[in-house]
Amino acid sequence: EEDKKFLLEEIYPYWENRCTGNISRYYIDEKIMKVLDSPYRVFNPLSRTRSGYGHYLPNIEKILKIGFKGIEEEAYRHLENLDLMDLELTDKRNFYKSMVIICEGVQVLQHRFAELAANMALEETDERRRKELLLIAENCRRVPYEPAESFYEALQSYWFTILIDYCGQNGSAISGGRVDQIFYPYYKKDIENGVMVKEEARELLEALWVKHSDIIKAGTYSSAKNNGGFATTINFVLGGVDAEGNDAVNELTYLCLDAEKSVFNSEPNTSIRVSGKNPDRFMKRVIEILVEKEGGKLPFFNDDIIIDALRDDGISLEDARNYAIVGCVEPTPYGNTMGRTNSCYFNLAKCLELALFDGKCQMSGQQMGPKTGKFEDFTSFEQIKKAYEEQVEYFVKMMVSSLNAIGKLHADYTPHIYCSMLLDGCMESGRDCTRGGAKYDFAGVQGVGMVDVGDSLTAIKKLVFEEGKVSKKDLLEGMRTNFEANPLLKYVLLNKAPKYGNDNDEADQMVAYVGKQYCKCVRQYKNLDGGSYRPGLFCLSSNTPLGKQVCALPSGRDSGTPLGDGGVSPKHGMDMLGPTAAAKSVAKVDHRLASNGVNFNLKFMPTILKTDADRQKLVDLIRAYFSMNGMHIQFNILSPEKLTEAQKHPEKYRSLVVRVAGYSAFFVELDKDIQDEIISRTLIGA
């Protein structure tokens, strides 16, 4: 109570007008702030003002090779060679001096841990544990300041590097990258030299997996709704190809899978890169773990389409092949990219609502968007498409403006010096990563509700303009009243127009149009540092709170209910023809345009994956879907009965991990609305 009083009466009042969250109001245009202050909005970038950006891949390999000692030496060299006539002289001098101070701080921190472990060893009576503590102390005296010389030191160096980053900027999704590639040289050397055996390496990996549960980021109310659970989304990646395009699966890949199976916690968010060059043995091992652990983790990513998408973004072939996943599903070049991969969610379904009501929000009655015409007066389907596109373009422009303002805010108030030390390009340019210093610079923005919009447009085209089964007046009235006075209308909308997810070209191409229009609209803009805006088609759990802001839709969706899950997944219960048809529909969306990532969820009954033949069919499904240029797929393998039981008796299911969207979480820690949404997803059974 004393701490609470101190926080409420002294700490919070002091920071109220000093924190970046409040200062952002002076950076974002007043017209846009009025939109953001409304409880009903198309986008909300303000969570990016309350912490550092996170969402990037630090160059861990560099730290392992040269240590922070090497970083410090580089900074000193650049200080000595500064051009006195450089117009950025003062900024660069301060930048490099800040790096030196941080490197000195890293030494202080690791030595504190070394001292703690040594003191614990003095009091330890168990000889085995005493030796472990002494080894920990020895490692902490060396790394991460010095280069790592062993597998154990490499893991310890990595953990310090990540931990310091989280403490420093309080961001999310600062990810580990391709751990089976990064740590393999140290593993191979120690095995060949007899320093350790596989079982010891596996135990160290398991300890590393466990440590990732130490980092819990407490979010704001809104961020907790958009990202259910306590996911930090530190992503590990296994498999794929190397920089030369060859199979990258190695012995350490399988040990990492063993560690994942043994620990199987919500963190780290371990992902699987899939190439046609990877052996089926690798895929089958992943499927075995998925089935045994009832899914909930280990999403699959398609190397071929992702590498092509990154090349379209201007990434070199070598860097594109060395991509890893940031956070949930965001493909990002490793160690050289200021990605800002989860900058904002954009509510596409709200734009359709506004397009049908001449820019007026039906939840508040206020004029929110531009006047794009009254649906009652439209004489062709093309007019509603045009109105929808104008609403999207209007709000995307606002979103970009606000994000650029937030970028300036971070550059002015919260330079990410530590992050800059871990990104190629910043040291060389003398610029912080918030000021365009990294080799590559992007911002990722996610379109949410693509399928809801596509299915709604299909219904309008077919039932209103082509067949005349539904009048414009009845449709608008049904949307206003949530179909309460006309339940038959809802039935017709749900059942008499084709739905995405059933390999129906009419429905699928409409959804593909919605995704393409959003992606192209986003791609025309640059951020303050000249980097591109990269579109994504995923939602984490934001489809639930964003759905609360949208009235009933022509697809038959009720007012305030969740928008489509995943991002490119078919709507719950609408994919009636099984997983193959669903996958074929999803593959018709141009994933290559959505280079910031997509999310495709499937849910299976455990009973259909019992035998080796069943599991091989799942491997074949994944490879077939990827051959059609699908980017991502992931699975929950649970019965709805078990999830319902866990909802009723959470104390019995505290370790139940589920796949929410692009991340995993303990089911019992999720908001009930998100639990209900997961339970309601289409279940594929025998």
Q: Could you say what each language-model-derived stretch is?
A:
Residues 108, 112-115, 119:
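Extended, non-transmembrane alpha-helical coiled-coils
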Residues 97-108:
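Extended non-globular scaffold/tether segments
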Residues 1-96, 132-135, 139-686:
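Conserved catalytic cores of very large enzyme subunits
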